[in-house]
Amino acid sequence: MSGFEDGFSAEKLFSQGYSYTYDDVIFLPHFIDFSTDAVSLSTRLSKRVPLSIPCVASPMDTVSESHMAAAMAALGGIGIVHYNCDIDTQASVIRHAKSLQVPIASDAVFKCPEHQIGSVDDFGPSSFVFVSQTGTLTPKLLGYVSKSEWSSMKDDQKEVKIYDYMKSCENKDYYVPWDIDLDKIEAVLEDKQKGFVVLEKEGETVNVVTKDDVERVKGYPKLGSGTVGADKKWMVGAAIGTRESDKERLEHLVKAGANVVVLDSSQGNSIYQLEMIKYVKNTYPELDVVGGNVVTMYQAENLIKAGVDGLRVGMGSGSICTTQEVCAVGRGQATAVYKVSTLAAQHGVPVIADGGISNSGHIVKALVLGASTVMMGSFLAGSTEAPGAYEYRNGRRVKKYRGMGSLEAMTKGSDQRYLGDTAKLKIAQGVVGAVADKGSVLKFIPYTMHAVKQGFQDLGASSLQSAHELLRDNTLRLEARTGAAQIEGGIHGLVSYEKKSF
């Protein structure tokens, strides 16, 4: 059809002076000559960190700690452990994540010895309450209380400390090696007739897995190729800031086994980050360093010249971020990803699209526009693996989710990523909220990745590399969507509906 053409090339669409979000643009379908199963989503986080799936857990204190990092690695992605804590805690989280060879985040509840169990609700969905000195999984379990035994106790027997009536965990039948696989755990539970097993490494508790956990995980999609480092353990990333004290933090994180470091800043084009990039590359040449955040080619060029191995793109696009509103700076995420990726590709630097991901379609758009991976916060928050306890609000089971620019997070130290001075006023660039229970990432991420593969198939791209080539040679065409087109492309015209993604 000479004289006619569908849509625009990406170069033309993104040169019109508009700041586009993912919802503002739509790809036009291309030709299919392969099956969905033939689509490969293998990629790179940075120059030397390969991944099987393009998913990265954001370094936020309500998203990425040990269980999330282990689960993401088991899925073929990676988690970046936040640094809104002291050095020893962050290093401990990394060591713990690398030890969770069975990446099950148990529903089990943990309490301190002096605590009481007030009601059966204290057990949550678990059949046990476990007791440790810290009231957490580590370093060692002291005992446990089963829900059935507690329910049969008299009221006056319950009005004492848990320590007074808990059962001891000294019996070695409860303990198994930390690197045992799920099938062997199930066999041990069956053989020993126990309700749970304790995974132990060098005398410390690594995880607790109950029969209920095993049954739940057996229903999840089968895991593919995990992200494993040279040490044969899960690859785990770590976030740090750009202050002088972060050099000491980095030393401890490298010793703990961090496989990649992410310089965590809302505006990465600063003298502080340039100096930190050079320090990391000179001091730890074997360690990949990801710089950012950036949204322009000018910002990206400075970090590339300094030696970054990856770029994190996004400013104010996260659901809990108010940077664009408060500071009047930022960029629509679709435009930012395309522009920065165009430059980064010329230097062989992978791009991480950070923020603005609400569904599988957004992931497809981010990847096809040039990103190698997507970094997710709210998409993973509220999952079983995310830090924090579930609570009920208006009848819905939720978990807290907060921006690292919220005042609540900044009081714990995250103001460093906003180049804040602790002696001066703190201005919030984020909010605190809650997200609904999503279940385990081990279940919903595989389904999400299959949806992404279907999107790639419709575009005629069998891999990320293929998609990037089709975009840059102008084969793939795009259009901007009007408000009415966005409404039409969503669910509309129904009195009521039930939406199930899988």
Swiss-Prot record:
List of residues that carry N-acetylserine: S2
Domain of life: Eukaryota
Domain named CBS: residues: 166-225
Residues that hold NAD(+) according to the record: D264, S265, S266, G314, M315, G316
GO biological process, one term: GMP biosynthetic process
Binding site for IMP: S319, D354, G355, G356, G377, S378, Y401, R402, G403, M404, G405, Q429
Keywords: Acetylation, CBS domain, Cytoplasm, GMP biosynthesis, Metal-binding, NAD, Oxidoreductase, Potassium, Purine biosynthesis
A cellular component annotation (GO) from this entry: cytosol
Cofactor(s) the protein needs: K(+)
Pfam families assigned: IMPDH
Reactions the enzyme catalyzes: IMP + NAD(+) + H2O = XMP + NADH + H(+)
Disulphide bridges, residue numbers: none
Active-site residue numbers: C321 (thioimidate intermediate), R417 (proton acceptor)
TM spans (from-to): none
SMART domains with a match to the protein in the record: IMPDH
Regulation: Mycophenolic acid (MPA) is a non-competitive inhibitor that prevents formation of the closed enzyme conformation by binding to the same site as the amobile flap. In contrast, mizoribine monophosphate (MZP) is a competitive inhibitor that induces the closed conformation. MPA is a potent inhibitor of mammalian IMPDHs but a poor inhibitor of the bacterial enzymes. MZP is a more potent inhibitor of bacterial IMPDH.
Residues where K(+) binds: G316, G318, C321, E488, G489, G490
Free-text function comment from the UniProt entry: Catalyzes the conversion of inosine 5'-phosphate (IMP) to xanthosine 5'-phosphate (XMP), the first committed and rate-limiting step in the de novo synthesis of guanine nucleotides, and therefore plays an important role in the regulation of cell growth.
Sequence similarity: Belongs to the IMPDH/GMPR family.
PANTHER family recorded: INOSINE-5'-MONOPHOSPHATE DEHYDROGENASE, INOSINE-5-MONOPHOSPHATE DEHYDROGENASE RELATED
Record protein name field: Inosine-5'-monophosphate dehydrogenase 2
Organism: Arabidopsis thaliana
